Each structure stands twice: as structure tokens, then as C-alpha cells.
Amino acid sequence: NDERRFADGQQDYTGWMDFGRRDDEDDVNERDVRGFGSFLGKALKAALKIGANALGGSPQQREANDERRFADGQQDYTGWMDFGRRDDEDDVNERDVRGFGSFLGKALKAALKIGANALGGSLQQREVNDERRFADGQQDYTGWMDFGRRDGQQDYTGWMDFGRRDDEDDVHERDVRGFGSFLGKAL
């Protein structure tokens, strides 16, 4: 294929990164884009295959677990990164994309849930405290930055709840002591 490679010296010894060859086409840019897209697709497919083999066992092991997968093909109990293989399907690219999107969605949802629980309590806990928030619209979406509540209630994490005005008159002193407590806990 040497005669079909670029005249400017761009060689493709393995053949997997030879995008943009100018065989009989005039629109080099379109060829580049399609070639690069194909390269990215192959690289992603190879990475997914390597990851599935490493994290989900050999293909033989995964085949043995077909009967334990979800009906939609999105789950593999032993291979948790084997996105949505459906043995009878032909459209591998669509399946990979949908399975990978499902995996990313589940991972993001889990991360957000863990972060919300760790930093600000569960959603139900925060909803219960809506009536205890400032009337001036200062909201606490995550629960870990809700400083300034006036009812003496403790923040879930407690490490940034400085400056509450419970029954004290000297707000500045309260702020200073609360901020010192915050720094102490943070350190």
C-alpha cells in the first residue's frame, strides 16, 4: 500500500492510524474526519474489549453467565464492565455506545449519591430542613455549606456551620468562634 500513502512522508506501518489517504478522493478534509472517526471508534472498541476481559473474565466465562444477565443485555454479574453485550445483535457500535452510556449514567448517579450523603445528608434529610432555612433565599443544595441557620440546629457535617444567631446578641463574636471551630475541624 506504499503507493497509496501520503507523498509527504506520513507512513502507516501498522495500518491503524492511516487516516486521510488521498486515493481517488478530492475532499481530503472529509476523508480525514471519517478516517479519524474510524480510528477513534476502533481505539474505543479495543479499550472496551481489553477492559471487559480484564474486569469481567474471559469470553468463555462471560458466555457461561449469559443466563444470569438482565433481559436487556445491560448487566453481567461477573463482568461489571461488559456493557450490554447482546449475542444476537449485529450493530456492535450502537450496542457499545448504549451500554457505555448506561455505565456512565450509573457511575455518575452513584458518585452523586455518595457525595450528597457524605457532605450533606440524604435528599430526604435536606427536604425536612427546608423550613429551617433563611427566608432570604439562601439555599443549601448539597447540605455542606448551609451556614447561618438561626434555629440552633446542627448542620449535618458540622464543619462549615459557622455564624448561627441562635440566642446570642454578639453576632460577630459568634461568627469568629464558629469560624475558628470550622478551621479547627478542617485542620
Swiss-Prot record:
Q: What are the Sulfotyrosine sites (modified residues) in this protein?
A: 13, 77, 141, 156
Report the record's disulfide bonds.
none
> Where does this protein reside within or beyond the cell?
Secreted
Q: In which tissues is it expressed?
A: Expressed by the skin glands.
A GO biological process held by the record = defense response
Q: Name one GO molecular function term.
A: neuropeptide hormone activity
Predominantly, its location class is secreted
At the top level of its lineage, which domain of life is listed?
Answer: Eukaryota
Q: Which residues carry this modification: Phenylalanine amide?
A: 19, 83, 147, 162
**Gene Ontology CC annotation, any one:** axon
Which Pfam families does the annotation name? Gastrin
Give UniProt keywords alphabetically: Amidation, Amphibian defense peptide, Cleavage on pair of basic residues, Repeat, Secreted, Sulfation
Q: Which residues form the propeptide?
A: 1-9, 23-73, 87-137, 151-152, 166-187
Q: Where is this region: Disordered?
A: 1-21
Which family does the record assign?
A: Belongs to the gastrin/cholecystokinin family.
Function, in words: The pharmacological activities of caerulein are quite similar to the physiological activities of gastrin and related peptides.
Protein name per the record: Preprocaerulein clone PXC202
The species this protein was found in? Xenopus laevis (African clawed frog)
